Amino acid sequence: MEILPILSDSYTLGFIGAGKMAESIAKGASRSGVLPSSRIVTAHSNPSRRAAFESIGITVLSSNDDVVRASNVVVFSVKPQLVKDVVLKLKPLLTKDKLLVSVAAGIKLKDLQEWAGHERFIRVMPNTPAAVGQAASVMSLGGAATEEDANLISQLFGSIGKIWKADDKFFDAITGLSGSGPAYIYLAIEALADGGVAAGLPRDLALSLASQTVLGAASMATLSGKHPGQLKDDVTSPGGTTIAGVHELEKGGFRGTLMNAVVAAAKRSRELS
């Protein structure tokens, strides 16, 4: 069967699963103008989840079958342990004229393609900062997904942050870094704030300063064009306060601990997939 292109100015996007990630993507797409809410559909039995989508102008249908029938692009955003059963149940409706997308962590592209019965599938790994339009997402293309399909999904996920393309074999490592990474940073923010309190700052000021410092440093690393090591060197004067703090971090194994966290999370992702 010929792979028909999906027209970016007229396609309908359907979500199978109406959780927080689906909501973040839907809001990002509609707010950015990538896709009007009138061309987004989903289904959910929970009144609060229905209301969350209806409040931004999204049509909530009565069943997942109806969502697939109404959609040109179908995004599976259910819990990983449910993906296989959901895809298999919908398989008769998952024709090649529809582009299929999964955002479920740990579910390999080869399995998604096998369950769907065709390879017009794209796997995407976003992360939770999608909720504020700052996701780090990575996609991998199935065997029948076209460059036009990739461009469409890049545009969609670009509305909630940044997206890169990588081979599916890297997704466990991606999970360990950007998938789990926000939790490492939240822990670092909390620790910085606690350090500020220990040094005499009020709690609210310490937390605000810690959060903004991480945000600013991340922006510098992204926008300056400099290696993070160079940025670190730029702020560490000889015999100054910053190098004293960096020395303590090095003595405590700060780098190695972060590296080990990524490796451990990637290993766990492989075990679960």
From Swiss-Prot:
<comment type="pathway">
    <text>Amino-acid biosynthesis; L-proline biosynthesis; L-proline from L-glutamate 5-semialdehyde: step 1/1.</text>
</comment>
<comment type="similarity">
    <text>Belongs to the pyrroline-5-carboxylate reductase family.</text>
</comment>
<dbReference type="GO" id="GO:0004735">
    <property type="term" value="F:pyrroline-5-carboxylate reductase activity"/>
</dbReference>
<dbReference type="GO" id="GO:0005737">
    <property type="term" value="C:cytoplasm"/>
</dbReference>
<keyword id="KW-0028">Amino-acid biosynthesis</keyword>
<dbReference type="GO" id="GO:0055129">
    <property type="term" value="P:L-proline biosynthetic process"/>
</dbReference>
<keyword id="KW-0560">Oxidoreductase</keyword>
<dbReference type="InterPro" id="IPR053790">
    <property type="entry name" value="P5CR-like_CS"/>
</dbReference>
<dbReference type="InterPro" id="IPR036291">
    <property type="entry name" value="NAD(P)-bd_dom_sf"/>
</dbReference>
<dbReference type="Pfam" id="PF03807">
    <property type="entry name" value="F420_oxidored"/>
</dbReference>
<dbReference type="InterPro" id="IPR000304">
    <property type="entry name" value="Pyrroline-COOH_reductase"/>
</dbReference>
<keyword id="KW-0641">Proline biosynthesis</keyword>
<keyword id="KW-0963">Cytoplasm</keyword>
<dbReference type="InterPro" id="IPR029036">
    <property type="entry name" value="P5CR_dimer"/>
</dbReference>
<keyword id="KW-0521">NADP</keyword>
<dbReference type="InterPro" id="IPR008927">
    <property type="entry name" value="6-PGluconate_DH-like_C_sf"/>
</dbReference>
<dbReference type="Pfam" id="PF14748">
    <property type="entry name" value="P5CR_dimer"/>
</dbReference>
<protein>
    <recommendedName>
        <fullName>Pyrroline-5-carboxylate reductase</fullName>
        <ecNumber>1.5.1.2</ecNumber>
    </recommendedName>
</protein>
<dbReference type="InterPro" id="IPR028939">
    <property type="entry name" value="P5C_Rdtase_cat_N"/>
</dbReference>
